[in-house]
A protein has these predicted regions:
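Short, contiguous alpha-helical
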Residues: 2, 14-29, 33-76, 113-157
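Helix-adjacent hinge/juxtasegments
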Residues: 63-102
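Acidic catalytic patch
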Residues: 100-115
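Basic/polar N-terminal segments that are highly enriched at the extreme N-terminus
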Residues: 1-11
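Soluble or luminal CAZymes and related metallo-dependent hydrolases
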Residues: 9, 16-20, 87-90
């Protein structure tokens, strides 16, 4: 590999992210319906609220990268688990549809997301992925506290 050869392609980054999203979906699905938006520990947010935050970041961020229109997803209303999973699946399809529209040079450009977060595009995307991983970890703790074995973290298929 030469110094000018990227170690990861945009497609590889998308597949990495989608692997995390598949795992997070399994964590959402592991929650009992009545605990998704009610169970928390130590005053922290419920996993349902965290999942809605992940949804609010994922597609709006990528859509903003593509179009430079930064429209936040503001609906944080509690919903039944089956509706949350349907929204998750729709956002996965949106991500797959939008991602190829990002020109390769765009990843190195500096943008201001949502009128307040100025950073390089690949760092904004990395933050969205990191935020999902962080919140999923909280979901793992909640599931264990509920006596439920969470999905194996290393299986992302």
């Amino acid at each position: 590999m030469s110094a000018n050869t990227p170690f990861m392609t945009a497609e590889a980054l998308l597949q990495h992210w989608q692997g995390h999203r598949r795992l997070t979906r399994r964590v959402i699905d592991a929650f009992p319906d009545d605990q998704l938006f009610s169970f928390s520990i130590g005053g922290m947010r419920t996993f349902g609220a965290l999942a809605l935050e992940i949804l609010a970041m994922t597609v709006p961020t990528v859509r903003g990268v593509v179009s430079d229109e930064w429209i936040p997803l503001l609906d944080h209303t509690q919903r039944p688990k089956h509706e949350l999973l349907a929204q998750w699946d729709a956002s996965t399809a949106d991500l797959d549809r939008l991602w190829p529209q990002i020109p390769s040079q765009r990843f190195a450009e500096t943008v201001t997301a949502f009128g307040q977060y100025t950073n390089v595009v690949y760092k904004l995307i990395a933050y969205a992925i990191d935020n999902e991983i962080h919140h999923r970890g909280q979901g793992y703790v909640y599931l264990r506290a509920l006596g439920i074995e969470p999905p194996p973290f290393h299986i992302r298929a």
